[in-house]
Amino acid sequence: MHDAVVVGAGHNGLVAANVLADQGWSVLVVEAEDEPGGAVRSGELIEPGYVNDRFSAFYPLTAASPVFRALGVQIPFRHGPLVLAHPSLDGTTAVLSRDAAETTMGPSWPEVMERWEQIEPALLRGLVTPFPQVRSALMLALEPSAAKLLRLRPDRLGDRLLLGNALHTDVPPRSILGRAFGLLLTAFGQRYGYPCVEGGSGRITELLVARARARGVDLRLGERLDRLPTARHAVLAAIDVWELARITGRRSRIQRDPATLKLDWTLDGPIPWTSEPAQHAPVVHLGGDRDFVLFGQYSMADPTRSPPGKETAWAYSHVLSAAEIEARIERHAPGFGALVRGRRVEELPAGRVNLGTARWRNQLVLRPFRGRPATGLPNVYLASASAHPGGGVHGGAGWIAAQAALRSASRRRARGLASLTISRT
């Protein structure tokens, strides 16, 4: 019997397996798919020689995450000249750059980033700390810099940047929470960029798998479970809460995030954007509240993704059809359709992208099991994006669940030693 069984070999499950193996535990990872990685996979999805990411594609949270630094995982990030562009048909373009002077957030933005640096450590600690984290949360709420950041009043282009970044989530972008998400992703983009991974996002998974196997972790693929496995110390469920509910027979109260339509393309050349900044930004935002499209173009940042002079790209939307997405791109880049060599369309059902809504009803202590990884089942921990700190490739949920399992085992061991000592006296 293994010390721990991790159900699910997405990045959170692999992070958890690595953390436990580092402490000398024997670990088995069981994955229903025929390959590990979950959302963090890539391949020649459309035609040979062109690499597209299966789901996640750009990684500001990964670049910022203390988890990957703690594990010593060196990810080969690649950046474009700019971070992102959000063009409008009126001829203006909002720009996010790692150079604050190029970012169109207005003249106060450098000062804003100075204030951001004062609160960023507390935010990053939140990625690896379970809630309720009352003291840290109160300290952050009372931090003057945090309050001033939320009162930021950018100009029109800056507001467009915040809006587009907020729309990476399913939160109303002009709400307080939406504004906070928009500011967070804008600031992380300023600090860390929106890098892609050289050769494809699957490289992250390969690095985590190699590290785990070097520490004796057993990885079994293509095994779908109908009941919880047994382990000496802990079972970590790196799966969504609805799959956990299916296995355990318990109901889940978490609300799903919206369905998503994702398109991938192989192209005969770079996208002919009418916006000059969009020609230099791997991430492009199109539209607004009701018709938002998130678009990615890889090869300007990572030439290994396609043959010379060619391009691979992707887009997703929560509200538009495939034809509407392509029509929207064509308006901003006339001639785009003529460059398309091949396309792949995937409809992702509700809950598939972030494993739960990012709205208030599923934040912090309102997340499943009051924001902590314990599930109410003995020694079973939730280690997926359904748990705090939620979606994004940062490894926080896997890290938190693994630390909880280690602490619980240590307490049980201490109680056992205490009982043994008492019985001998």
Mark where each language-model region is.
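FAD-dependent oxidoreductase catalytic-site/capping-region signature
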Residues: 298-360
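Active-site-proximal substrate-binding core of FAD-dependent oxidoreductases
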Residues: 407-425
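N-terminal glycine-rich phosphate/pyrophosphate-binding loop and immediately adjacent elements
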Residues: 2-118
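Helical element adjacent to the flavin cofactor pocket in flavoenzyme catalytic cores
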Residues: 183-225
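A conserved FAD-binding loop/helix module that cradles the flavin
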Residues: 383-409
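A glycine-rich dinucleotide-binding beta-alpha-beta segment and adjacent secondary-structure elements
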Residues: 158-172, 334-388
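Mid-domain catalytic core of redox enzymes
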Residues: 88, 221-307, 422-424
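Rossmann-like flavin
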Residues: 89-177
